[in-house]
Amino acid sequence: MAGLRRGAAAVAPAGTAGFGRPGRPQGRRQQELGKQRAAPRPGPRSKEKKKVNCKPKNQDEQEIPFRLREIMRSRQEMKNPISNKKRKKEAQAAFSKTLEKEAKGVEPDIAIPKFKQRKWESDRAYVRRMEQEAQHVLFLSKNQANRQPEVQAAPKKEKSERKKAFQKRRLDKARQRREEKAAERLEQELLQDTVKFGEVVLQPPELTAKPRMSVSRDQPGKKSLMLKKLLSPGSVSQPLTTSLARQRIVAEERERAVNAYRALKRLQQQRQETQSPQPPHLPPGKKPEMQL
């Protein structure tokens, strides 16, 4: 035992006076560590002690208040585009990490231990360590909330009939607007006239389409009068289509009227012959003499 203590004392550094013996160099090191811990962390966001009603160190110089310094620092960061870009980049990285976690799903709370015998670890210590970790995992699994991994996710809630009808009406209106726009675009394309290079126009175009809200009025000289129809050269009255019986009756009436007219003319001629005197009979070749 004395040899082991001497070996430990020989292995220990010169600054320490053994494992349990407090010495002067060890106390100095503890003082240095205490000073390092007491010193504030470097950086603009270090916590400063609030001094209330304290006498200034220098009477000629007055320190800037803490709040004012914070406001000035925040304004300086806003003016500096590099810090803003860095802040945005950090926010984007954090957001992407959260999205990845949500995509992967909830990680298991209990980590599965992996056993491997360490270097210079005895078999007994290795078995004891495995038993401790196994007991710890069993304890965590017992106190963990009940899980149901075999249960499937709840089906999505179907849309109500009212919502379906509303979406259908909205889709119909959108389709109708698209059709109206397409018709208007086609109408604009039809109304647009493409004039070729070197084309000659003899007269302005005639507008045949009427305005929507206009009242149709006949212009002077363009009224459809009966006299214009009669005087027009191409206006020939077309015979009306009648039946065969009607045509036979009309033909008989026409023939009777013609026969009556001929009989009347013959009777008038006979009366004239009886009333007028007959001229004297002259030999052929002689003309009647004229008396003065």
Curated annotation (Swiss-Prot):
Residues 1-16, 222-232 have a biased composition (Low complexity). GO terms for cellular component: chromosome; nucleolus; nucleoplasm; nucleus. The keyword Plastid does not apply. Residues 1-94, 139-183, 205-243, 263-292 are annotated as: Disordered. InterPro entries: CCDC137. The modification Phosphoserine is found at residue 232. This is Coiled-coil domain-containing protein 137.
